[in-house]
Curated annotation (Swiss-Prot):
Provenance organism: Burkholderia cenocepacia (strain HI2424)
Entries under Pfam families matching the protein: GatB_N (PF02934), GatB_Yqey (PF02637)
SMART domains membership: GatB_Yqey
Protein name per its UniProtKB record: Aspartyl/glutamyl-tRNA(Asn/Gln) amidotransferase subunit B
UniProt superkingdom: Bacteria
Classification via PANTHER family: GLUTAMYL-TRNA GLN AMIDOTRANSFERASE SUBUNIT B MITOCHONDRIAL AND PROKARYOTIC PET112-RELATED, GLUTAMYL-TRNA(GLN) AMIDOTRANSFERASE SUBUNIT B, MITOCHONDRIAL
Sorted UniProt keywords: ATP-binding, Ligase, Nucleotide-binding, Protein biosynthesis
Amino acid sequence: MATQWEVVIGLETHAQLSTVSKIFSGASTQFGAEPNTQACPVDLALPGVLPVLNRGAVERAIRFGLAIGSTIAPRSIFARKNYFYPDLPKGYQISQYEIPVVQGGQITIQVPANEKAGKPAYEKTVNLTRAHLEEDAGKSLHEDFAGMTGIDLNRAGTPLLEIVTEPEMRSAAEAVAYAKALHALVVWLGICDGNMQEGSFRCDANVSVRPVGQEKFGTRAEIKNLNSFRFLEEAINYEVRRQIELIEDGGEVVQETRLYDPDKRETRSMRSKEDAHDYRYFPDPDLMPLVIGRDWVERVQSGMPELPAAMQQRFVDEYGVSAYDAGVLTSSKAMAAYFESVVAKAGAANAKIVANWLMGDVSSQLNRDGIEIDAIPVSAAQLALLLQRIADGTISNKIAKEIFATIWDEKATDEGAADRIIDAKGLKQISDTGALEAIIDEVLAANAKSVEEFRAGKEKAFNALIGQAMKATKGKANPQQVNELLKKKLG
């Protein structure tokens, strides 16, 4: 990509709030129902109906605002955003324009290293402009209608929190890092389920380019409804290339809305991009101003979970894990909870081995089976006992991996599964010095060549002798004792 161009990106993210009912009606928000079975008279915009604000949606917006250090507006208003679309029965969307409920705020992101480009990993803070409440529209269905379009209004009225950043991101990598951080946060807070396939979390990317050093922004294009992190990255990268090539060929970028085609991996024009005045915003006369008192904010604050950044630091301070490990362990609330449950039973002294196992064998098995940590078939108590048996020398780490796989595969329910399997299979580690010395003497006698090579300065020969000793004990020997006894006997 040409280095004389600077990329400017701002994201607008729509997070469906996890309320049982819609933002202005009592209809269900459950996903997957038969079309138009969850649309009440308010959602259908029948004559004479009036909207009633869902308190739960407001509280979820407050929770988000508190988490990002924003200002919660003591008084905000709802506005009508006027436009025509078949899946918008009223002919307008109830949203917020002049006074949003959440104002400002920041999210810190970790941008991974780009080895191909020679760029190291770095941290960046993205400032948010606002987050406002609004209702979702219905959905147009283009299949199974013999060339016509069907309208499903089940989604109409589902509460959304639209989260808008400042145009501060300078690459697709930064945009994806921000989207992932935001996604993790709204799921952590319990305000959105984050299911991107179902449309619970989707992004619009505003992309423009300008010559390096120029202060004025270039003309932007908005790419709508990106519902995967991969699509977000691909769409931005394509759009940046398209705009640069267009300008360098003497053309001009036009302000427009574009869609991303994942099959062709390109964006295509959808319509000219509207400005705010095109929507003719005005206050909704059917809704009173939203007044949020200090006491309401404090009640929400009192129910806030510990935030990921604070938990990361606590894990470093309390359990002695590295900052990187703490970041991985707090990547989801379920992972953090499982870690602390295991540590509570295994003991804080074993926190580091717990962390290593969660990031190693446990994560590997989860990925293999395609499940999340909250569906793990090995309970915290079972894993804690297994790790205690490593710590007290009953079994080796290698044997522990075999036992873990057995507990996982048989979906054992007994807390003492590790001890049961150790006894049933005779897996206890050999730690008796006399027994180990006898085995090592046999190994040295049978491997005279390796002994000579070691004494000649070849370190690899020592590892070969350890391997033979472990083989002779079928992996049951205490590796540390084998190492020490070999060194002693070899002088």
